[in-house]
């Protein structure tokens, strides 16, 4: 097994492991018959991210990207369907889901019908997916600032931080090995935000085991 194959396996293992953290929320919803205290938007944005990268993987013919995002999109769809079943705010949830579907339709028309197949199509899709992934990695920064203000790490999940670090590192190295900056660059912020979390755990006290807060998505 060469280094690229090793990185591919690492990307699959760590990323799928991260996606399965949503199973905790799934079990919680089934046990309580309620979607209270479970965030819906992360499921939706991660699904959108997965589908975007799945399309990118199909255009590029990258089996690792395709496999990971098929699993990711499937799991997010299960989480979304479960949330829709148990939530009391069905109108809001259906509206947000419909908005996501609309965005997907517009994106598909643009990337499939407006842009001619080729390098420009792949580059624009890669750039779009990269920007979306970076925004997802940077979105928890407001929470980190709040943690620094309150000096409490109770809202952080150490296991999810570890998973994010290894997942981001694997994809960064994988993209670097392929020379694909659309894969490498958007995963770099995940490394830095994970290091910030590790520092906060060290600075503000011992690691507090808790149920992972399902927030992030990876390609």
Curated annotation (Swiss-Prot):
<keyword id="KW-0762">Sugar transport</keyword>
<protein>
    <recommendedName>
        <fullName>Sugar transporter SWEET1</fullName>
    </recommendedName>
</protein>
<dbReference type="InterPro" id="IPR047664">
    <property type="entry name" value="SWEET"/>
</dbReference>
<dbReference type="InterPro" id="IPR004316">
    <property type="entry name" value="SWEET_rpt"/>
</dbReference>
<feature type="transmembrane region" description="Helical; Name=6">
    <location>
        <begin position="156"/>
        <end position="176"/>
    </location>
</feature>
<keyword id="KW-0677">Repeat</keyword>
<dbReference type="Pfam" id="PF03083">
    <property type="entry name" value="MtN3_slv"/>
</dbReference>
<feature type="domain" description="MtN3/slv 2">
    <location>
        <begin position="124"/>
        <end position="204"/>
    </location>
</feature>
<feature type="domain" description="MtN3/slv 1">
    <location>
        <begin position="5"/>
        <end position="90"/>
    </location>
</feature>
<keyword id="KW-0812">Transmembrane</keyword>
<comment type="similarity">
    <text>Belongs to the SWEET sugar transporter family.</text>
</comment>
<keyword id="KW-0333">Golgi apparatus</keyword>
<feature type="transmembrane region" description="Helical; Name=2">
    <location>
        <begin position="38"/>
        <end position="58"/>
    </location>
</feature>
<feature type="transmembrane region" description="Helical; Name=7">
    <location>
        <begin position="189"/>
        <end position="209"/>
    </location>
</feature>
<dbReference type="GO" id="GO:0051119">
    <property type="term" value="F:sugar transmembrane transporter activity"/>
</dbReference>
<dbReference type="GO" id="GO:0000139">
    <property type="term" value="C:Golgi membrane"/>
</dbReference>
<dbReference type="GO" id="GO:0016020">
    <property type="term" value="C:membrane"/>
</dbReference>
<feature type="transmembrane region" description="Helical; Name=1">
    <location>
        <begin position="3"/>
        <end position="23"/>
    </location>
</feature>
<feature type="transmembrane region" description="Helical; Name=3">
    <location>
        <begin position="63"/>
        <end position="83"/>
    </location>
</feature>
<keyword id="KW-1133">Transmembrane helix</keyword>
<keyword id="KW-0813">Transport</keyword>
<dbReference type="GO" id="GO:0008643">
    <property type="term" value="P:carbohydrate transport"/>
</dbReference>
<feature type="transmembrane region" description="Helical; Name=4">
    <location>
        <begin position="98"/>
        <end position="118"/>
    </location>
</feature>
<keyword id="KW-0472">Membrane</keyword>
<feature type="transmembrane region" description="Helical; Name=5">
    <location>
        <begin position="125"/>
        <end position="145"/>
    </location>
</feature>
<dbReference type="GO" id="GO:0005886">
    <property type="term" value="C:plasma membrane"/>
</dbReference>
<comment type="function">
    <text>Mediates sugar transport across membranes.</text>
</comment>
<keyword id="KW-1003">Cell membrane</keyword>
